[in-house]
Swiss-Prot record:
It catalyses: Hydrolysis of terminal, non-reducing beta-D-glucosyl residues with release of beta-D-glucose. Optimum pH is 6.0. Its EC number is 3.2.1.21. One of its GO terms (biological process) is cellulose catabolic process. Optimum temperature is 45 degrees Celsius. This is Beta-glucosidase 1. The keyword Hydrolase applies. GO terms for molecular function: beta-glucosidase activity. Keywords: Carbohydrate metabolism, Cellulose degradation, Glycosidase, Hydrolase, Polysaccharide degradation. It comes from the Eukaryota.
Length: 40
């Protein structure tokens, strides 16, 4: 969760790129979706 929050704070471009990488990890789709949603 901390990583997601930091990625969102980093910025839109980096946030999206990192969010895509984190999506590969065994995390719930809801968490990834929330992170991406916040980036938008």
């Amino acid at each position: 969760l901390v990583a997601h929050e930091e990625n969102v704070r980093v910025g839109k471009d980096e946030g999206f790129a990192k969010a895509g990488g984190l999506s590969r990890l065994p995390l719930e789709a809801g968490e990834s979706g929330t992170a991406t949603f916040n980036v938008r």
